[in-house]
Amino acid sequence: MLPVRNYGETIEEYEVQHLLGKGGFASVYKARCRRTYQDVAIKMIDKKLIHGTGLSSRVRQEVEIHSRLKHPSVLQLYTFFQDANYVYLVLELAHNGELHRYMNQQMSHPFTEADAATILQQVVAGLLYLHSHNIMHRDISLSNLLLSKDMHVKIADFGLATQLKRPDEKHMTMCGTPNFISPEVVSRLSHGLAADVWSVGCLLYTLVVGRPPFDTDAVQSTLNKVVMSEFIMPTHLSFEACDLIEKLLKKNPHERISLEQVLRHPFMSKRSAGAEEPQYNSSKPGACDFYMEAQGQSVASGDSGIVTFASNESRSSQRLRSIEKSAQSSSNPQMLPQIQEEYGYWQPSTEHKPYPMPLSSDNAEWERLGSKGNQPHTAASVITEEQQMRVPPLNTIRLQPTRYKTKNAIMSILRHGEVVLEFVKFRSKLNEDRVTDICRISGDGRRIIIYQPDPGRGLPIREQPPPPESHIAGDKSVYNYDSLPSKHWKKYLYAARFVGLVKSKTPKITYFSSLAKCHLMENMIDFEMSYYSGAKYVKTSPGEELKLYNNYGMLLSDLACPEAKKMIEHGNECFSHCINICNALELAQQSADSRNTCFPVTIGRRPLTDVSHSQRFDGLRDTTNIAYSTPKSHQGSINFSMSTISSVQNGSESVSSTHSHASRAQIQASQQNVPIKRINIPDVGIATELSHGIVQVQFYDGSMISLIPEIQGGGLTYTQCNGVSTYFPKYDGDLPLAVRDRLAQIPQVKLRLKCAPLLSNHRKADNIAMTPKSTTPSTPCYNRIVL
């Protein structure tokens, strides 16, 4: 049992002094015990707030875990009690406050590698103690590491800690501080003790560099970098420091170095000679004596829902806990946003604000988090130009060539991966827009060339970026990533955002499930599913609302309906499966020749039950075991012409028996409206231009869009995979999402068709011969594509 006899069991037995910190559910005060005259920190948790949000059991969970612990590197919980209004936790007082605040305000510069090794040794010793008892902390950060009077590091704040039943047990909860959260936690994959190892890597990087490895101006971009494990290793670090950081920040948790190996790493030899040796030894029989039984009721495994404080004059760690995916959780997430607003939960902090878990879909909080208090230094720190950009080097590996025009710039990704930005200004003397500035960035983001073509005049806008100028001066126009002047950072950020957008639309893994075709994009966050029934599941960046569309392309507003629940359940399963596939292939790719790549990759195939035997090409060998067909249509051929439609409606007999001028004109028009151009566009489908100006695109998923010129009435016709054809008279914003997605490919299609050669006369004749002269509804013709 806890040695509580020396500490008071009521608040009256303490002399409460000044406030140390305040949050949404609790306040922390410095106090002195009237019995022992010892200074302590008392956290007062408002019972009304935790009962109102169903977080009572989570408070007990934190108390249960923390009260069992006693180790030199763990902040001690002396005792706890309650009255009618509050739950009181009597904690060890850390006189020198948070490590984060000490580094930024007292030192105003990073730690030396020797001091960082000393701090790391104490933190690792404390984590080894926790892990030996199957306790996962899940929120190791500089704000949760406190400094005692003798400058010993103490692990604090067990609000997110969880008790594992066995060392290999996995959890699915997304929680923690964004700058220190692991990729598997962000991706909502199963995670275990290795998540704390990742946080140790972020901690070491922050100690020796002065800022977290994945720090950005916004929570969302930070999480994106964490998922991609993109960080910059400064050149001034020693080889030992770089090696240990890289081993700690392995994206695959199974590849990370163990905590025992950290203590034996050569970097730890930099530790100061007078540093205290590790006091952890799990092999000693008495080691478990410190792991004492908790008072009170045992509770189910789950997160604490409170904000904890335990440092001198510290600000709150301000984290919003996610709900465990367990039936034992009984919190009411709908009430949390109201409490956050009423009690000032989102307070500015010099450290990255925690990521609000999926309890609210309001993106306003994201904007607040991304706009304040995310600098790695305090306001008193001097921000020099030598500091690096808050965006990692871009990377265009596997991205296809593309070109996109905005009002003021034209952005391109070339075939060899180079990114080109052409900035456009209107020249009144020439009465046209001209390219006045050009920024070229290598595919790995390391080399940047900036120049002005034909100064004063600029270049005319062309279909392709202009070639690099041969007369560019060396150090005035050519930079590397680390030496890029701050005046050009916006250009680089502009390019990085463009590459990020392209990644969010470029499939990395295509997976055919039993119900849908799934695309996991290159950024490892965006995920889309096109159900074979016509429905759609769209998952984008963390914090943005999941979007579901029914078979008719209408957005589902009620995500609690049975249809939406089934789609969400299947979507989450497929997303996790694609992430696991990606991790496995990346592991195989790392062990193989670096010149070989596994991506993009297609896994599985569309179920054969969706394709009837009669829909297959006779005499053709289906190399992918799958044939897609467009649904039944009243159009006798792939050509969308009014004469063909009329011919279909009247039947073949009416055509053969009528010799009127109108019929002859219809037949003549039908024969004239033949394909004149046809190309196969990778990742899009087969595009055809007809002699009457109609442009048809047969997509690889079996759907089709026909763009009708104004002379023939205008508009477009969209045919779904399930056979439903819809005519839209205008290209307005009311189009269904499926149509808008496909229309986004049309500029590329038209550009490719413009450059495509005309079909030969032999090819035209073959096509005319293959086109049915007439078709009745009882004998439909199917347009088929074999992939």
UniProtKB/Swiss-Prot annotation:
GO biological process: centriole replication; male meiotic nuclear division; positive regulation of protein catabolic process; regulation of centriole replication; regulation of protein stability; sperm axoneme assembly; syncytial blastoderm mitotic cell cycle
One Pfam family hit: Plk4_PB1
Domain called Cryptic POLO box 1 (CPB1): residue spans: 386-505
UniProt keyword terms in alphabetical order: ATP-binding, Cytoplasm, Cytoskeleton, Kinase, Nucleotide-binding, Serine/threonine-protein kinase, Transferase, Ubl conjugation
Reaction equations catalysed: L-seryl-[protein] + ATP = O-phospho-L-seryl-[protein] + ADP + H(+); L-threonyl-[protein] + ATP = O-phospho-L-threonyl-[protein] + ADP + H(+)
Keyword Iron: no
Domain POLO box intervals: 675-755
Posttranslational modification: Ubiquitinated by the SCF(Slimb) ubiquitin ligase complex; leading to its degradation by the proteasome during interphase and regulating centriole number and ensuring the block to centriole reduplication.
Domain of life: Eukaryota
Location of the Cryptic POLO box 2 (CPB2) domain: 506-613
GO cellular component, one term: centriole
Regions that span the bilayer: none
SUPFAM superfamilies: Polo-box domain, Protein kinase-like (PK-like)
Catalytic residues in the record: D139 (proton acceptor)
Binding site residues for ATP: L20, G21, K22, G23, G24, F25, A26, S27, V28, K43
Function: Serine/threonine-protein kinase that plays a central role in centriole duplication. Able to trigger procentriole formation on the surface of the mother centriole cylinder, using mother centriole as a platform, leading to the recruitment of centriole biogenesis proteins such as sas-6. When overexpressed, it is able to induce centrosome amplification through the simultaneous generation of multiple procentrioles adjoining each parental centriole during S phase.
Subunit description: Homodimer.
Family label: Belongs to the protein kinase superfamily. Ser/Thr protein kinase family. CDC5/Polo subfamily.
Protein's recorded name: Serine/threonine-protein kinase PLK4
Organism: Drosophila willistoni
Gene name of this polypeptide: SAK
